[in-house]
């Protein structure tokens, strides 16, 4: 082993655990001594090989025993040309990283600046902070020992967990009618959970430094991703259903918490990702409330970019195989993210660091064409591309056994996938304008939606995930005050949205599900659908909406969300 405090530290980590970390004497002898406070690497060396080659990325291996540090250094963002102030450092290792518990800190000079370098074995990630880190190594160790996740890139307001007012336990279930939205509300723990963004999630998103946001955006657009100029064999932009196996994007994104669309929160026992979060959209509402503030538009665009990076199921192969429930959900949420990014970019002047709205439009059109073609595939069941291959649901759901009793295939959309798809199709019809949205929405309502609604029996209303955006709105009102957005944002009135079903305007501040569910059925009825199921479902919903008096959709949703 090389001499110096770093080697002593490594030995101390390994010693009490025996031979947990295999040692390579040759590599250890070749490794230079690294001490606390040493300058590991200077990136602005004009004679450096990476600089002469004109590469954006350089990997520098700092050998210490059987592991290495890999520095991903980019002098400037290919997106906006501005130099990065945050450098992401990845640590790779060939054995179990859990054996190394203490955190180590060094100083590094990058791009002519000095940074504190912090890392932790359990996270396989090192971050060179562009500002002083307000916690000690001992505090970092305490975070890990208590099983708390490190909030990489959280920005200048980072505090120790003991100082975080919203660092309270996340229960498995908190009823939504017990006191309304609170910072510690957490999630219901059910598969039909669709929001809201809890206070700590909003804090994490909003407190990310500007440098970290630009780094994340750069990941979404260029680094190990699908750049906008990449085309498929047919000359069209890559579709959502194009497998990207060579890039191994799923594995790539799993290891980088700060690159998830909505990253993990300290204290939360699960990760919000595209497979289990049902994709709440935290950026659309504040973007509208702040009159398209670039911060929130960028967040929504990054979410859409990450969709292109991470959603890789083969929706329509040569064999015409069925698509399972999870892929149907991913299709709905992915198209929604692309749709919202398209709508926001269309409504604001072009920005140098954001892709053009035409990129999202082309991808939406290509995937709509694929979905419409799926309608004509024989033997594909209801709508073809939306079907569940597994005869079970990962969580108990009251629609499961009713679907058995009504003779449907066991487990068909036992979750809320039917509502997610209905929601996405309704918003696509209003925001994008492509006539294929209406074609898909009408076909989906006629072939599947009404029967799925009626099959849930007495649960048909209780099981609608009627989470009003109003619950998000109260949170964003608090967030607007916390981050210093214009005060009138917090005082804007709530917009009623019981508009005609054929109203082309957008529902400005809501993503409420019962309305979108109802609209699809109503459109199918007006299009001449000769279906008793559609007529019955509409009659039931209208009776519920008008129960006692003529209620608006918000009142209807609020009543059934409890």
What role is predicted for each listed range?
Residues 2-35:
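Solvent-exposed N-terminal domain segments of exported/luminal and surface proteins
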Residues 22-28, 35-41, 45-562:
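Catalytic cores of extracellular degradative/oxidative enzymes
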């Amino acid at each position: 082993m090389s001499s110096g405090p770093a080697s002593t530290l490594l030995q101390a980590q390994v010693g009490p655990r025996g031979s947990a970390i295999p040692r390579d004497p040759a590599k250890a002898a070749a490794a230079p001594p690294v001490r606390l406070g040493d300058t590991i690497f200077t990136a602005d060396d004009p004679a450096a090989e990476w600089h002469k080659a004109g590469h954006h990325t350089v990997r520098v291996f700092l050998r210490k025993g059987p592991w290495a540090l890999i520095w991903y250094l980019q002098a400037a963002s290919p997106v906006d040309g501005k130099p990065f102030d945050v450098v992401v450092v990845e640590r790779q290792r060939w054995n179990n990283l859990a054996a190394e518990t203490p955190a180590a800190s060094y100083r590094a000079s990058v791009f002519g600046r000095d940074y504190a370098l912090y890392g932790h074995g359990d996270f396989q990630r090192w971050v060179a902070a562009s500002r002083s880190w307000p916690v000690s190594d001992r505090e970092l160790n305490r975070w890990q020992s208590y099983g708390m996740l490190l909030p990489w890139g959280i920005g200048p307001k980072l505090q120790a967990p003991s100082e975080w007012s919203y660092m309270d336990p996340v229960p498995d279930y908190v009823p939504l009618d017990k006191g309304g939205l609170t910072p510690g509300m957490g999630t219901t723990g059910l598969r039909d959970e669709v929001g809201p963004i809890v206070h700590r999630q909003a804090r994490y998103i909003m407190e990310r430094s500007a440098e970290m946001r630009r780094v994340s955006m750069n990941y979404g657009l260029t680094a190990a991703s699908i750049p906008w100029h990449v085309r498929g064999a047919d000359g069209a932009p890559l579709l959502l259903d194009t497998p990207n196996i060579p890039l191994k994007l799923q594995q790539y994104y799993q290891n980088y918490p700060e690159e998830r669309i909505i990253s993990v929160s300290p204290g939360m026992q699960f990760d919000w990702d595209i497979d289990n979060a049902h994709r709440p959209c935290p950026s659309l509402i504040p973007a509208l409330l702040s009159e398209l503030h670039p911060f929130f538009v960028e967040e929504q665009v990054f979410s859409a970019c990450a969709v292109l990076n991470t959603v890789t199921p083969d929706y329509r192969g040569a064999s015409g195989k069925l698509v399972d429930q999870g892929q149907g959900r991913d299709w709905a949420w992915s198209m929604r993210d692309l749709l919202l990014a398209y709508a926001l970019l269309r409504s604001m002047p072009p920005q140098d660091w954001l892709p053009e709205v035409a990129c999202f439009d082309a991808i939406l059109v290509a995937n709509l064409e694929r979905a419409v073609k799926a309608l004509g595939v024989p033997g594909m069941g209801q709508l073809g591309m939306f079907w569940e291959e597994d005869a079970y649901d990962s969580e108990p759901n009251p629609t499961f056994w009713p679907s058995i009793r009504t003779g449907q295939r066991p487990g068909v959309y036992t979750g809320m996938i039917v509502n997610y798809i209905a929601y996405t199709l309704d918003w696509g019809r209003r925001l994008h304008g492509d006539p294929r949205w209406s074609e898909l929405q009408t076909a989906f309502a006629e072939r599947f939606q009404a029967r799925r609604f009626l099959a849930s029996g007495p649960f048909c209303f209780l099981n609608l995930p009627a989470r009003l955006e109003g619950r998000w709105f109260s949170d964003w009102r608090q967030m607007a005050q916390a981050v210093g957005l214009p005060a009138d944002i917090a005082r804007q009135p709530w917009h009623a949205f019981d508009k005609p079903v054929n109203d082309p305007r957008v529902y400005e501040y809501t993503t409420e599900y019962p309305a979108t569910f109802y609209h699809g059925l109503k459109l199918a009825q007006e299009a001449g659908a000769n279906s008793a199921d559609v007529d019955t479902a509409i009659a039931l919903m209208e009776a519920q909406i008008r129960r006692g008096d003529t209620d608006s959709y918000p009142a209807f949703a609020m009543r059934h969300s409890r």
